[in-house]
């Protein structure tokens, strides 16, 4: 495992046909952080992640460790250790859990080599299976997994790729309470030696597991800090309640 590196964003700006979607964002996510990114619809959360992962053009700077990410294509950014999930898990559903992990870990190997049944499971794949809690499901088709298990498998696929910066888009959407708790515990383990950023709207989940929170509004950073600090921020209250109340924001924040 490579040493964890932090994400440093400075003056990030994304413009679509004259519309400023991300407006000069500065953001620091330290190694080992489990950062939650929240904000109303149109706040710029997903667009910011799109810029970091090379899906949209942006100006400014986004550095992961010593590497500048802006201006690189998606595949080069991935090879620098940046991994991403979307709201719908991207799996090979007809293949087994083990085969999905094998393919994810198999850059540079032929498809036949990746799909053949072997006597021993590689150490990195075995470790990922244990981390995501799917060791006993390794030989079942990924399409038969429960919703939460599919999300865990996708995270496992990033782990075997040695992703050191994980950008996760609403990982607990549609999960049961038990799945959400297990996912929160999984993210805590993953973040122990990686940098993890979670786009989320579920405030109960955020309260339970976020280490730090960044609130975006209209493409800018509105507030940042612990969950308690963000909820008590008058600026956040103004955006979500229409006025500052002096009481913490308790309602669910839309993604």
Question: What do these predicted ranges mean?
Answer:
Residues 2-255:
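Glycine-rich phosphate-binding loops of nucleotide-dependent enzymes
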